[in-house]
UniProtKB/Swiss-Prot annotation:
Gene3D superfamilies with a match to the protein in the record: 3.40.50.2300, Methylesterase CheB, C-terminal domain
Keywords from the UniProt entry: Chemotaxis, Cytoplasm, Hydrolase, Phosphoprotein
Domain CheB-type methylesterase: 186-379
Entry domain remark: Contains a C-terminal catalytic domain, and an N-terminal region which modulates catalytic activity.
Top-tier EC class: hydrolase
Organism, scientific name: Pseudoalteromonas atlantica (strain T6c / ATCC BAA-1087)
EC numbers, comma separated: 3.1.1.61, 3.5.1.44
Entries under Pfam families matching the protein: CheB_methylest, Response_reg
Full protein name: Protein-glutamate methylesterase/protein-glutamine glutaminase
Gene designation per UniProt: cheB
A GO-annotated cellular component: cytoplasm
Known catalytic reactions: [protein]-L-glutamate 5-O-methyl ester + H2O = L-glutamyl-[protein] + methanol + H(+); L-glutaminyl-[protein] + H2O = L-glutamyl-[protein] + NH4(+)
Length: 379
């Protein structure tokens, strides 16, 4: 039986092209088309789709408002189509905060031309969310503030920013801890934390980073699969929500302790240097069959392994595909510890599963448990 899809967009051309693309895959069936958010709410209630594709800008009711109402009344996986502008990036992040599970850039030219990479991307993203119907997160879940954890080497930083409630990305009733470990810190020496993620990552990263205290004594390197126009807005949002400084990494910038660096979208990020000084190399890489992502977790993690050797806690969060497996393997070979997000709390279990199946990961946690275990391990 085919998965049922509801397509929501005020453009009849875009709706029809999305329908044609999705139905090229026999496992996908578009059962309805809505012109605005209000129609989407009504059709979700009557048609029971497995997944909804949602535009942001629409008359009568916009996509963000519709997402909030759908997630409050009848939760269903939603994938947003967003313009590649700063405004579009901010709107998409709002939609993800409201409960949407994923997003895709809205590129009319790719859709119109029926480009095979665009076709494959849309079909794969929609099918991944169809498979993740169970265990939907609600629009918002209040999260208790983390207990204070003191580090031996406080770092200087700007005055603490305002605190806000984080949005949970795990289903209600999910266990908080899945590792067989007792949770006792290993006592290992660390010099940095490295995180790789893709689908579902924005909410997962927000959950983890908002729990990190301002005196965290190590740099944090983050690779999130995102378009170039999105990462700056995402870094700014995380910076507002977090106690520590979060910023988009810049070429040649010196790495500082207590700062979280987000890899710029559409480019590659590596670190270079020695024990005295580490800096970033941000560069444009040609398209390659071997490198599917910009930024790429494997590339960043490999450079971290070269500079920091085994003094690293490597984390792979929710995401599609297997990016991060090779990089995590290189970190592991140097003596680093590798943890992954569990299947139940992952929006898509592809990246964590690839690392688990390769025998690289030592521990597996739900996203709700990650923050406390990271802080305990690295304290």
């Amino acid at each position: 039986m085919a998965y049922k899809i509801l397509v929501v967009d005020d453009s009849i051309f875009f709706r029809r092209r999305v329908k044609e693309i999705l139905e090229q895959d026999p496992s996908l069936q578009v059962i309805g088309e809505a012109r605005n958010g209000q129609e989407a709410i009504e059709m979700v209630a009557t048609l029971n789709p497995d997944v909804v594709t949602m535009d942001v800008e629409m008359p009568i009711m916009d996509g963000i408002t519709a997402v909030k109402k759908i997630m409050a009344r009848k939760p269903v996986p939603i994938i947003m189509f967003s313009s590649l502008t700063l405004q579009g990036a901010k709107a998409t992040l709002d939609a993800l905060d409201s409960g949407a599970m994923d997003f895709l850039p809205k590129k009319f030219e790719d859709i119109a031309a029926n480009r095979q990479d665009a076709v494959a991307l849309l079909q794969s993203r929609v099918k991944s969310l169809c498979r993740k119907q169970h265990g939907l997160r609600p629009a918002s879940v209040r999260v208790a503030p983390p207990k204070a954890i003191l580090f031996n080497k406080p770092v200087s930083r700007n005055p603490a920013k305002r605190s806000v409630q984080a949005t949970s990305s795990i289903p209600l009733g999910a266990p908080l801890y899945h590792s067989s470990s007792s949770g006792i810190p290993s006592g290992k020496k660390y010099r940095c934390l490295a995180i790789g993620t893709s689908t579902g990552g924005p909410v997962a990263l927000q959950k983890v980073l908002t729990a990190v205290p301002k005196n965290f004594p190590y740099p944090i390197f983050i690779v999130q699969h995102m378009p170039g126009s999105f990462t700056k807005a995402f870094a700014e949002r995380l910076n507002q929500l977090s106690q520590l400084t979060v910023k988009e990494a810049m070429n040649g910038e010196e790495v500082k302790a207590g700062v979280a660096y987000l890899a710029p979208g559409g480019r590659q990020m590596t670190v270079q240097g020695d024990s005295q000084r580490v800096s970033f190399r941000i560069y444009d890489a040609p398209d390659s069959a071997d490198i599917l992502y910009k930024p790429c977790v494997d590339i960043t993690f490999a450079s971290i392994a070269h500079v920091y050797h085994g003094d690293v806690l490597g984390v792979i969060l929710t995401g599609m595909g297997s990016d991060g497996k090779l990089g995590a393997s290189k970190l592991k070979s140097k003596g680093a510890k590798i943890w992954v997000q569990d299947e139940l709390s992952s929006v898509v279990y592809g990246m964590p599963q690839a690392v688990m199946n390769a025998g690289i990961a030592e521990k597996e946690f739900s996203i709700d448990a990650f923050e406390s275990h990271i802080l305990k391990e690295m304290a």
